Amino acid sequence: MIYFLSDAHLGSRAIDNPLAHQQTLIDMLQSMAKDATAIYLLGDIFDFWCEYFWRDKSKEQYRPFLQTLKELTDKGIDIHFFIGNHDIWTFGWLAKETGITVHRRPEELTINGKRLFLAHGDGLVPSNYLQQMPKAIQKKIKQFIFLRRVFHNPILQFLFRLLLPAWANEFGYEWAKNSRLKELARPCPYKGEDKEELVLFAKEQEQLGNHHDYYIFGHRHIELDLMLSRDSRIMILGDCWQQFTYAQMDNYELRIMNFEL
């Protein structure tokens, strides 16, 4: 069995009981480990993650989760970690500590004879999307694109890693907390097949001849299972922050499931 999950936002200051939340995710992974050959973590597993040049005591809060990843990879389960827009800044320590494989960009894979497109989902929009939006929306999208470029800039990443972790983490965790609180105050539900960015992106890929049987994303914190055509399908995984939804794939079927809390 192959599993896909995303958006746990471990360590979020917007979570009332972060240790209990972490334990739920651990229970979820251990349940999957009973029959898993691979687990794909599709981004934003951490609410904020950065590997500095200095020792960072804040990583100790994740020790139970990191130990679980190590135990699973030691058993021969392949665990793939896709960076999201909250946990971009991993530079080798996480992979070395746990045995996972880190992916920094979308991947196109063939699994069980099916062609898959896997990504967190941030920054994926159709080529003409910006021009079609009202000016107010264009402004917000441009701000997001600018911020994403800043976060992915190698020079700025290097400089940020030079900061003392206590100072940098305060900024990072507060920024991430504000993002979560905004989502709670003003949730963004499914926009519809003709407006949802990831749906439009997947449709454009199909139109361009870049066919995939499944497109699997996180990022949006919505649960979606939609047929794009007779032989192409998109799934948005929900999240492991509030919903604890995931997808599982066997030889015959891919479906979204709920973890029983």
Listing of model-derived features with the role each one plays in the protein:
Residues 1-3:
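Extreme N-terminal starter segment of soluble prokaryotic enzymes
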Residues 5, 10-111:
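Core catalytic region of metal-dependent phosphoesterases/phosphodiesterases
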Residues 9, 109, 125, 241, ...:
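Residue-level detector of flexible, active-site-proximal loop/helix-junction positions
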Residues 47-73, 171, 180-212:
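N-terminal short leaders/motifs
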Residues 97, 101-104, 117, 122, ...:
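Conserved beta-sheet core of the metallophosphoesterase superfamily
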Residues 121-200:
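Active-site-proximal loop/helix segment associated with metal-binding centers of metalloenzymes
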Residues 251-261:
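Arg/Gly-rich low-complexity intrinsically disordered repeat tracts
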